[in-house]
Amino acid sequence: MVKMIVGLGNPGSKHQQTKHNVGFMAVDRLVKDLDVSFTEDKTFKALIGSTFINQEKIYFVKPTTFMNNSGLAVRALLTYYNISTKDLMVIYDDLDMAVGKIRLRQKGSAGGHNGIKSIIAHIGTQEFDRVKIGIGRPSHGMSVINHVLGKFDTDDMITINIALDKVDKAINYYLQEKSIEKTMQQFNG
């Protein structure tokens, strides 16, 4: 069996450590202890790394398209590697959740997230596993775009690092147990 873990974000150094790139940050945290390195694949428009966990091939992906076109890379990789959408996990930011809160879901709408909208449009289903990481709402008077493209302040970064550790544990549990339901029971709350 093959699984694909996708972290959403925007490419380029100016977007590193921004709220919208928390999906990239989560994937980077996941691969840190697995001795996985990323290679840029221009054909698939993604940074791709892989390893085996319990005899199962796991692809870690960071699309190099901008957020709104994430579905291009996801669809191309699912097709090329013949991976079912049931074996897809997407990690992304959610501004409707408090900073650092995480929630695993089995399926659902895009909830206004353009990266998820793109994935749903390109793969033709809402039925794929996901991890949402809360980045909070913009402060009064700040636009959503400025909020998601802004960096975390020091206190929020501490909270996000704790959340990234929790996401790391949740994804590893998910890969061991091979069950989103069990993982949701263990980590949602």
Curated annotation (Swiss-Prot):
<comment type="function">
    <text>Catalyzes the release of premature peptidyl moieties from peptidyl-tRNA molecules trapped in stalled 50S ribosomal subunits, and thus maintains levels of free tRNAs and 50S ribosomes.</text>
</comment>
<feature type="binding site">
    <location>
        <position position="114"/>
    </location>
    <ligand>
        <name>tRNA</name>
    </ligand>
</feature>
<keyword id="KW-0378">Hydrolase</keyword>
<feature type="binding site">
    <location>
        <position position="66"/>
    </location>
    <ligand>
        <name>tRNA</name>
    </ligand>
</feature>
<protein>
    <recommendedName>
        <fullName>Peptidyl-tRNA hydrolase</fullName>
        <ecNumber>3.1.1.29</ecNumber>
    </recommendedName>
</protein>
<dbReference type="GO" id="GO:0004045">
    <property type="term" value="F:peptidyl-tRNA hydrolase activity"/>
</dbReference>
<dbReference type="GO" id="GO:0005737">
    <property type="term" value="C:cytoplasm"/>
</dbReference>
<dbReference type="Pfam" id="PF01195">
    <property type="entry name" value="Pept_tRNA_hydro"/>
</dbReference>
<dbReference type="GO" id="GO:0072344">
    <property type="term" value="P:rescue of stalled ribosome"/>
</dbReference>
<dbReference type="GO" id="GO:0006515">
    <property type="term" value="P:protein quality control for misfolded or incompletely synthesized proteins"/>
</dbReference>
<comment type="similarity">
    <text>Belongs to the PTH family.</text>
</comment>
<dbReference type="InterPro" id="IPR018171">
    <property type="entry name" value="Pept_tRNA_hydro_CS"/>
</dbReference>
<comment type="function">
    <text>Hydrolyzes ribosome-free peptidyl-tRNAs (with 1 or more amino acids incorporated), which drop off the ribosome during protein synthesis, or as a result of ribosome stalling.</text>
</comment>
<dbReference type="InterPro" id="IPR036416">
    <property type="entry name" value="Pept_tRNA_hydro_sf"/>
</dbReference>
<keyword id="KW-0963">Cytoplasm</keyword>
<feature type="site" description="Discriminates between blocked and unblocked aminoacyl-tRNA">
    <location>
        <position position="10"/>
    </location>
</feature>
<feature type="site" description="Stabilizes the basic form of H active site to accept a proton">
    <location>
        <position position="93"/>
    </location>
</feature>
<dbReference type="GO" id="GO:0000049">
    <property type="term" value="F:tRNA binding"/>
</dbReference>
<feature type="binding site">
    <location>
        <position position="68"/>
    </location>
    <ligand>
        <name>tRNA</name>
    </ligand>
</feature>
<keyword id="KW-0820">tRNA-binding</keyword>
<feature type="binding site">
    <location>
        <position position="15"/>
    </location>
    <ligand>
        <name>tRNA</name>
    </ligand>
</feature>
<keyword id="KW-0694">RNA-binding</keyword>
<dbReference type="InterPro" id="IPR001328">
    <property type="entry name" value="Pept_tRNA_hydro"/>
</dbReference>
<feature type="active site" description="Proton acceptor">
    <location>
        <position position="20"/>
    </location>
</feature>
<comment type="subunit">
    <text>Monomer.</text>
</comment>
